[in-house]
Every structure is written in structure tokens, then in C-alpha cells.
Amino acid sequence: MPIHFTEERMKKVIADHDRWWRGELGRPLVRASITDAYPRGPRPKAPILAQENVHDFSWTPEEIVEALEWELESFEYLGDAYPVVDLACFGPGVLAAMCGATLDNSSGRVWFFPCEKDVTKLHIRYDPENKWARRIKDICRAGIERWKGSIIITMPDLGGILDVIASLCGTEELLYATMDEPEEVHRLILEAEQAWQEAYADFAAILAPQGCMTNWNGILSAGTTYIPQCDFAYMIGPDMFREFVLETLRRDTERIDNTIYHLDGVGQLIHLDMLLSLPKLKAIQWVPGDGKPGPEMWPEVYEKVCAAGKNIMIIGDGRTNSSLELLPKLGEKIYSGIWASSAEREDVVRYLKAMGIEA
């Protein structure tokens, strides 16, 4: 069965995403996918790639890609949506596994376990022949060969620099090291940055024929793009953030064309002013966190981000959050996504029109 999307649509979607990054789109960016709009063909034997099965190398990359395509056969793409395969299923911060950490998905979710808890003995190197790096690259190559840009493959979720270090040595060990052995933490930061850059370049070279790049957030870019993040920052104060995190984020934003920081949890709001001071950072994704009020309850955060000249990614279904209420103030700075059934299609189309978007 075909993927219901044209080459011309893909060109327009890429161009519109780039205009959004530059602040020239003149409207919000909204990806709206109807997940059950069309019938699928016979289901392939291979499973749909997910955290629970990434360890199963018995399926060839070609078989994995065939199953991923089958999943998308039923989708209709409205607004700024497009066909995409998300490789974040290998876990958040999979660079750690490519540098020696143990990837364990026996619980059904991917977790990473340290390879060396003594920070003075830990040395971080990207291994392009690591089994996880090779597996993901092989799947990327198979997808590029089969789809030739008609379905976009994301960059794997390599992770944030401090988060990768925490996976390699242990979060508690890293916290103690920031106080007891800060010089070792600074060394590890530089090593992790080098490993990250090498991994990014390795995957980017394979994905280059797509003519665009994206990540687990789905925001396309004709140039390089990534999601700098530091979940570790939830556990440290502003002084430590300034010493250990801010400059590595600055370097991230200066190396990559279009960046959006993953601001995860209310504990990170104390760092927001420093994040907004980064001139090359283009956008913020605000995630309040489990048990906290939903996205619609934080208009002051969105307004602060946009007042600093940054775009904002609003999580959750755009129809149920504050994007319409924020539209008069934030307008073209908003990005949101919708995944809906065919029974909801008319409602989705009405929402898109209210946002100034033709379905």
C-alpha cells in the first residue's frame, strides 16, 4: 500500500518548517496526523520497532523498515505533518550505549547502566563499530535506500552531554563529582562533547540524502538540528548550571543550525533566564512534568520565552492546550502537534483553520 504523501508536499513542508525557524512563516506550525485514515496492506512479520524489542537483532534492517512503513500506510497528513520514523525507540541518550554503557530493555523500557563509576577512570569515546551504533546505522541505510526521502528518518536520541555522562558513571556519582572533583567533570564534558559530535556526524552523513533533518520532536530543518537538553540540571542549582551546563549548551547551539532546548520539569525553570540568554538557541520545548498542571496552565512561561525572541513547542494535543488562547500573543512562534483518529478529522480541520492553516 502507498504512503499518502507527495514529493511536492514534502518540499513545501520542509520549506515551511525552515520559515518557522527563521520567524518568517507568519503562522504557527502544526503537525496534524490522522492515524487511521486509510487501510493497510498485509502486516509484515517483523515487529514495529519499539523500546521493548530493539534488542532483537534477528530481524534484518530491511524487514524492520518494511514494518515501519506498514505502520504509516494508514496515516493522513494535515497541516505541517509528514511521514516520519522516530529512532528515539533506542532510548533517550543512546550515545551512552555507543560509548560503553549497558543498554537494558528487559523491563520493556530502555535504561542505561554505568560502565565505570569512578569518574577519574572513566574515558568517553564514541565507537562507530559499537553494536548499537551499527544497528541504528544499518536501519537508517535501509530506510534511505527504500524510501529515498519519502519518509523521513529521525536522528537517534543521542542525549544531552551531562545526561550521557550520568548514564556512563551513575547519576549519584556525577553529582558528588561536581562538588568533589569538578576538574574531572570538566574533562568528561569535553570528552562527551567530542563523542557526541563524532556520532552526530556519523549519522548525519547517512541521513543526508533525505535533504533535511529532524529529531524525536519532529521539527524539520533543511540544515542541522538537534534538541540540546540536560535532565541532570533538575538536580542542580543555578551556580552549578552556569559552571557545568551553560557553556556546553552554548557550544551546542553554535555548532548546530536550529536548536530547541528540552526544558523538562518545574525544577528547570530556575535555569530559564540563562537558557534564554543563549543567542543561537532558537526555541524551547516546555514539559511541566508528571503530576504537574498541564501545558495550558503555563502561559507565563510561553510568554517569557517568546518575549526573548525564541519559538515555543507546546506539548500535548494542540486542541486541548492553550495554543488557541496564546495565538493572539505568540502567533507564529507556536509549534504543536496532533495525533487523532478519522472520527476526529473534522474537529482537527476546524482547529487548523482557527490557527490560520489550510488542512
Task: State where each predicted segment sits.
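Active-site loop segments of alpha/beta catalytic cores
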Residues: M1-A50, V54, E71, L78-V84, ...
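A contiguous, low-structure linker/loop signature
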Residues: V84-L122
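Internal helix-loop-helix
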Residues: T60-E63, A67-A88
